[in-house]
Amino acid sequence: MQVEETSIEEIQTKIKRLNSKAGQMKMDLHDLAEGLPTDYTQLMDVAAATYEIYRQLDELKQELKKLENAK
């Protein structure tokens, strides 16, 4: 049971950090989009990085839900 608690806490900490990073990436992507066509060459890289952060966040949230339901 202690192992599960630690895992849940670790995942919650990772989610918190990723949420902060994801919010910043979302704002960066928004700012880049507002400035189009300037810096359009960066659009795919920023979008891909933003997608990856949100994919990781979704994966962690699903893992957390499984651990919490297993209790």
Swiss-Prot record:
Regions crossing the membrane: none
Pfam families to which the protein is assigned, alphabetical: Rop-like
Record bears the keyword Transit peptide: no
Keyword terms of this UniProt record: Nitrogen fixation
Top-level division of the source organism's lineage: Bacteria
Keyword Metal-binding on entry: no
Any one Gene Ontology BP term: nitrogen fixation
Family: Belongs to the UPF0437 family.
Protein name from the UniProt record: UPF0437 protein asl1434
Record organism: Nostoc sp. (strain PCC 7120 / SAG 25.82 / UTEX 2576)
